[in-house]
Amino acid sequence: MARKALWAKSFLKEPKFKTRKHARCPLCGRPRGYLRQFDMCRICFRERALRGEIPGVKKASW
């Protein structure tokens, strides 16, 4: 299945059992690397953090 079809299928249809539900990024539809705290995948999180769109988040440096 195409990525858009999987995304639409996961957002529109509720699974029969709660354990079957898999979190997806609402911005790009990516099923892996999902950060619950920010409700997006790691790639979208990184892009927005570097642009300064997520308050209180900055790139680590040590």
Curated annotation (Swiss-Prot):
This is Small ribosomal subunit protein uS14. Binds 1 zinc ion per subunit. It comes from the Bacteria. Its cofactor is Zn(2+). Part of the 30S ribosomal subunit. Contacts proteins S3 and S10. It comes from Persephonella marina (strain DSM 14350 / EX-H1). GO terms for molecular function: rRNA binding; structural constituent of ribosome; zinc ion binding. PROSITE patterns: RIBOSOMAL_S14 (PS00527). GO terms for cellular component: cytoplasm; small ribosomal subunit. InterPro entries: Ribosomal_uS14 (IPR001209), Ribosomal_uS14_bact (IPR023053), Ribosomal_uS14_CS (IPR018271), Ribosomal_uS14_sf (IPR043140). Keywords: Metal-binding, Ribonucleoprotein, Ribosomal protein, RNA-binding, rRNA-binding, Zinc. Zn(2+) binds at C25, C28, C41, C44. Binds 16S rRNA, required for the assembly of 30S particles and may also be responsible for determining the conformation of the 16S rRNA at the A site. Belongs to the universal ribosomal protein uS14 family. Zinc-binding uS14 subfamily. One of its GO terms (biological process) is translation.
